[in-house]
């Protein structure tokens, strides 16, 4: 089957580049920004990996696996050749109670902890119609302890019932990203949560539906404008296909080698500085 060529991401990039308002920002770099945007990706049409530049799949996969360990240590990533968190890591490699800590070990007032990911899997298996299948990384009490406050802050799962007898439900995921670095960050975020949706669907014996990305402050940094212009001059290809080689015993048992991306056609990588 011929896969369609989608360009939601490039459309957002073009919108911000042409209509964004000039704003100052925390890093002192300066941005062009729009507020509020949504993209919907049908995961049955292909895996939404940006094709107008090469995206570093190893970093995306390993970062997601790191989140799922619940670790706060950058050493876990650097030991696997991933350096995307180096700019924020403290001298001892610790990053504070960032994404994985909140996902797996949200602290409660009585001294306990909540494993939000385990709760998601449990609820999807026992009560898939629930409207409370949500994971939040935005823990207000912990924000000042984090090396970087969560950009992708909250996500929710939704199961559409099977349309025929004996069929499977379809799992969709919606992410709210309060701060969206369009050039560097968003391609990673789309792919990361699309991958997580596939993994959760496999663990819960569901088919995949849509991944919906909702952005708050959607911005292009002033020192990314040349790179954005180059990328917008390229024609996108069809998205690749994802093959998960095995079904592990739990959502926490996946390994890097479990994921294979087929027919990933892409333009060359484009380097750009990260705003810290």
Curated annotation (Swiss-Prot):
Keywords: Cytoplasm, Methyltransferase, Nucleotide biosynthesis, Transferase
GO CC terms of this entry: cytosol
Organism: Polaromonas naphthalenivorans (strain CJ2)
Name the UniProt record assigns to this protein: Thymidylate synthase
Biological-process GO terms, alphabetical: dTMP biosynthetic process; dTTP biosynthetic process; methylation
Pathway: Pyrimidine metabolism; dTTP biosynthesis
NCBIfam families: PRK01827.1-3, PRK01827.1-5, thym_sym
InterPro entries: Thymidate_synth/dCMP_Mease, Thymidate_synth/dCMP_Mease_dom, Thymidate_synth/dCMP_Mease_sf, Thymidylate_synthase, Thymidylate_synthase_AS
Pfam families reported in the protein's UniProt record: Thymidylat_synt
Family: Belongs to the thymidylate synthase family. Bacterial-type ThyA subfamily.
